[in-house]
């Protein structure tokens, strides 16, 4: 899942700031979220997050690791074509972070694989933080089997759900933003109709 970590406004030139009108991060309770996701997950948890959130998420799962309830790692998505946003003022942000936690005995199909994944950014421009479909497919393949259930608690435009469906996984997704919910539903309905042909 890709939790809220703030949207920037798109107006004007120069440095962009947090768009407080659309920032779910201001009302997002990380500890409640982590406890609930841990409680309902049987296998692996992957949480894409902002750099400011890594420590809190990693600490939560490190405590579970100390109790021998699983293993935690940081995943890095190295973007081969980072967005040039603010590039005239600062270094480009060429990576995205995720925290990966595998509960004991969970599926893992990626023998001796590195935690750095190199892919271009998503190309559809339908969501500001859309993930590359091949990246999502690789993570699903590495951490699940066919017919497993994929949960995306912040599904945005539905990319993870779409890839889960294409890879013969069951899925459940949640999205608070009505526009993104409608878009995700439309994408999934179209894919399901196409697969039935």
Which ranges hold each PLM region?
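S-adenosyl-L-methionine
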Residues: 185-197
């Amino acid at each position: 899942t890709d939790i809220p970590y703030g949207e920037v406004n798109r107006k004007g030139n120069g440095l962009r700031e947090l768009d407080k009108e659309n920032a779910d991060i201001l009302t997002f309770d990380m500890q409640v979220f982590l406890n609930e996701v841990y409680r309902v997950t049987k296998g692996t948890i992957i949480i894409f997050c902002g750099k400011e959130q890594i420590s809190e998420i990693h600490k939560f799962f490190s405590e579970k690791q100390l109790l021998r309830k699983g293993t935690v790692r940081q995943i890095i998505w190295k973007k081969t074509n980072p967005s040039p946003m603010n590039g005239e003022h600062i270094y480009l942000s060429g990576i995205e972070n995720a925290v990966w936690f595998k509960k004991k005995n969970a599926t893992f199909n990626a023998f001796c694989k590195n935690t750095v994944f190199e892919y271009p950014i998503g190309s559809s421009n339908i969501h500001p933080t859309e993930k590359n479909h091949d990246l999502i497919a690789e993570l699903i393949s590495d951490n699940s089997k066919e017919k497993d259930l994929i949960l995306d608690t912040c599904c945005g435009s539905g990319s993870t759900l779409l890839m889960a469906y294409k890879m013969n996984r069951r899925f459940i997704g949640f999205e608070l933003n009505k526009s993104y919910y409608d878009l995700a539903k439309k994408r999934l309905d179209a894919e399901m109709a196409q697969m039935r042909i």
